[in-house]
């Protein structure tokens, strides 16, 4: 992995002042761009109701980093509930700074806080930042590149934690039984849209008793399949003969 040269203190302080001025409109929160049945969870007509959501670039923060970035005693303020119960897009955003002062302003913070901070980007985002972010599943950040996070009250330099989030599907145990899969298995997602149908292999199953059936893909993947115009989505077991992706072990 190439060595990254981060901005010096003077450059970072200039970026802090820019963040405080709020010169760029806030980044939109992650949204769903296709749903099986009017956004309702549970089962419909005897089948699990599948929802496919595009996850825009975002970050997760520790309690300590929230206070550094937004001030002593600061807490994440929920702005919009996400589809999975207990998770939300916060009011707060940060600026993500990569090598050579390349930056992404107003990156949304998702809550609740975590034991480690992590930044999730699409491939085009990582190119824009000048960071060679690997494809990893959430939480698998060992050996990944870092970045600088800039908030209105301070900065945090991450030594690791910048990833391109691997596509995955959340489901509960009843959903998993329906599809004949278990936590950690790989599935296949077929998205049919006019002149732009795409099949995504290597979709990691993340099964939990309280989860709702929801696929997460990033903005590049959503644009590639023209998800806004999708006429049908099909979630199925990955066909025999397809090898597991290398990212499964990361």
Where are these regions (language model features)?
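Protein-protein interaction and targeting regions used for scaffolding, dimerization, and localization
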Residues: 1-46
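Extended, non-catalytic scaffold segments that flank or surround catalytic motifs
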Residues: 3-6, 15, 34, 38, ...
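Short beta-strand-centered segments at strand-helix junctions
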Residues: 51-54, 58-99, 105-152, 157-190, ...
């Amino acid at each position: 992995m190439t060595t990254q040269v981060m901005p010096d203190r003077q450059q970072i302080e200039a970026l802090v002042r820019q963040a405080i001025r709020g010169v760029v409109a806030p980044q939109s929160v992650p949204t769903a761009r296709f749903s099986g049945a009017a956004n309702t969870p549970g089962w419909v007509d005897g089948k699990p109701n599948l929802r496919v959501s595009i996850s825009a670039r975002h970050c997760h923060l520790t309690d300590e980093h929230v206070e550094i970035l937004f001030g002593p005693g600061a807490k994440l303020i929920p702005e919009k509930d996400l589809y999975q119960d207990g998770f939300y897009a916060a009011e707060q955003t940060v600026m993500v700074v990569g090598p050579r002062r390349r930056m992404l302003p107003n990156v949304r913070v998702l809550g609740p806080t975590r034991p480690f901070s992590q930044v999730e980007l699409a491939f085009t985002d990582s190119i824009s930042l000048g960071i060679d972010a690997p494809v990893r599943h959430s939480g698998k950040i060992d050996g990944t590149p870092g970045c600088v996070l800039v908030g209105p009250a301070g900065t945090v330099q991450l030594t690791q934690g910048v990833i391109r989030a691997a596509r995955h599907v959340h489901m509960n145990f009843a959903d998993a039984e329906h599809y004949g899969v278990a936590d950690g298995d790989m599935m296949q997602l077929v998205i049919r849209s006019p002149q732009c149908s795409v099949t995504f292999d290597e979709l990691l199953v993340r099964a939990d008793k309280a989860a709702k059936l929801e696929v997460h893909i990033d903005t590049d993947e959503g644009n590639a399949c023209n998800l806004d115009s999708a006429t049908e989505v099909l979630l199925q077991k990955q066909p025999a003969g397809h090898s597991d992706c290398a990212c499964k072990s990361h």
